[in-house]
């Protein structure tokens, strides 16, 4: 049986824990209970089959793998946000492409360099 897929919400939760410095602080920022934040991160680690955080005193610290995956998850969340923005713009009737009109007298070589 295939393992359940990790959700964007789980990545956002991990980011909040790291950015806020702990589970309680992340829960406050996310407007969720601390137990739901802890569960989301524990489930994420379980689904990935590796620890992303280790507890050092009262602070959650990223493991090496956690650090690598957190960086990539930030890109993923940013791309997902951009995709949602694009969908919203398309729904509003915005063009999905840019049209460039250039006078025939403009040197083609310059145009090609500028667009490269």
Locations of the language-model features?
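The N-cap/first-turn positions of alpha helices
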Residues: 7-10, 34, 66, 73
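Short alpha-helical "packing" element that flanks the helix-turn-helix/winged-helix DNA-binding module
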Residues: 10-17, 69
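Short helix-boundary/capping micro-motifs
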Residues: 17-31
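Alpha-helical residues within the helix-turn-helix
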Residues: 28, 46, 67
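Residues within the DNA-recognition helix of helix-turn-helix
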Residues: 33-36, 40-43, 114
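A short LG(V/I)-centered, amphipathic sequence patch enriched
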Residues: 45-64
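Alpha-helical linker/hinge and terminal dimerization helices associated
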Residues: 47-48, 69-91
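Interdomain hinge and pocket-entrance segments immediately C-terminal to HTH DNA-binding domains
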Residues: 88-108
């Amino acid at each position: 049986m295939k393992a359940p897929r990790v959700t964007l919400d789980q990545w956002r939760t991990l980011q909040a824990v790291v950015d806020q410095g702990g589970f309680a602080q992340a829960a406050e920022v996310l407007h969720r209970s601390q137990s739901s934040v802890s569960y989301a991160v524990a489930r994420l680690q379980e689904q990935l089959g590796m620890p992303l955080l280790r507890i050092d005193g009262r602070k959650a610290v990223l493991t090496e793998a956690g650090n690598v995956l957190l960086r990539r998850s930030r890109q993923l969340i940013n791309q997902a946000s951009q995709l949602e923005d694009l969908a919203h713009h398309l729904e509003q009737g915005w063009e999905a492409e840019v049209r460039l009109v250039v006078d025939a007298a403009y040197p083609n070589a310059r145009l090609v360099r500028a667009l490269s």
